[in-house]
């Protein structure tokens, strides 16, 4: 398989700081050179279920995500084709008709909690980063995010964390740390590690014909 574009994976637990690391890379390497994809966009549509059942769905299990579509999109971008990213509504748990078109770029950056779990995704990545953050800090960040950005109640966030987020992290996310080329401790606030990753990306871009 061609190594162009360069595919970078940023994994880690929920609210670990993956997006902060991704944004740092985007700023340093240049957003015009990176196609940025969030794995959360690929949650399966639950519109066929009653809203009450959707709210109880285990979104932290690998089966909750449409990885076939993500793989197809990655392969299309690598083939020089534009793709239409799905849009997911976290308040109603459905895939919306609106999409976001992204064009091929020299770098594809994929972030998500489970992107290292699936071998079919992992094999496509040349650089794999894992953001390692204390569980208490991740929970606080998730609580704030889900209330402010996703319209969730405190009770629903806590219930979901205890029922699925924490156990699924221990079963499916934490073990994938071993696949990482670089581990970011402390929530990704590590400028030295960012410098190393950016230097590696730039070197790979220069070496690509």
From Swiss-Prot:
One MF term in the entry's GO annotations: uridine kinase activity
Residues annotated for ATP binding in this entry: 12-19
Any Pfam family hit: PRK
Enzyme Commission number(s) from the entry: 2.7.1.48
Keywords assigned by UniProt, alphabetized: ATP-binding, Cytoplasm, Kinase, Nucleotide-binding, Transferase
Record has Translocase as a keyword: no
Gene Ontology CC: cytoplasm
Metabolic or biological pathway, per its Swiss-Prot or TrEMBL entry: Pyrimidine metabolism; CTP biosynthesis via salvage pathway; CTP from cytidine: step 1/3; Pyrimidine metabolism; UMP biosynthesis via salvage pathway; UMP from uridine: step 1/1
UniProt-annotated location(s): Cytoplasm
Single Gene Ontology BP annotation: UMP salvage
Reaction catalysis annotation: uridine + ATP = UMP + ADP + H(+); cytidine + ATP = CMP + ADP + H(+)
Family statement: Belongs to the uridine kinase family.
NCBIfam families cross-referenced by the UniProt entry: PRK05480.1 (NF004018), udk (TIGR00235)
Cross-referenced HAMAP family: Uridine_kinase
Protein name: Uridine kinase
Species per Swiss-Prot/TrEMBL record: Chloroflexus aurantiacus (strain ATCC 29366 / DSM 635 / J-10-fl)
Recorded name of the encoding gene: udk
């Amino acid at each position: 398989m061609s190594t162009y574009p360069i595919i970078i994976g940023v994994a880690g637990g929920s609210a670990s700081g993956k997006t902060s690391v991704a944004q740092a890379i985007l700023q340093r390497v240049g957003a015009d050179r990176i196609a940025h994809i969030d794995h959360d966009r690929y949650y399966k549509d639950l519109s066929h279920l009653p809203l009450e059942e959707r709210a109880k769905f285990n979104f932290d299990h690998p089966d909750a995500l449409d990885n076939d579509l993500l793989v197809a999109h990655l392969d299309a971008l690598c083939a020089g084709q534009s793709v239409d990213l799905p849009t997911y509504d976290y308040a109603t748990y459905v895939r919306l008709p609106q999409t976001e078109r992204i064009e091929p770029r020299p770098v594809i950056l994929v972030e998500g909690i489970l992107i290292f779990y699936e071998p079919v995704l992992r094999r496509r990545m040349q650089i794999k980063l894992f953001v390692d953050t204390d569980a208490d800090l991740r929970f606080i960040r998730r609580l704030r995010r889900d209330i402010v950005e996703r319209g969730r109640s405190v009770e629903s966030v806590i219930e979901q964390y205890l029922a699925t987020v924490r156990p699924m992290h221990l079963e499916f996310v934490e073990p994938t740390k071993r696949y990482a080329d670089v581990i970011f401790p402390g929530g990704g606030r590590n400028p030295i590690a960012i410098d190393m990753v950016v230097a590696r990306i730039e070197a790979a871009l220069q070496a690509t014909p």
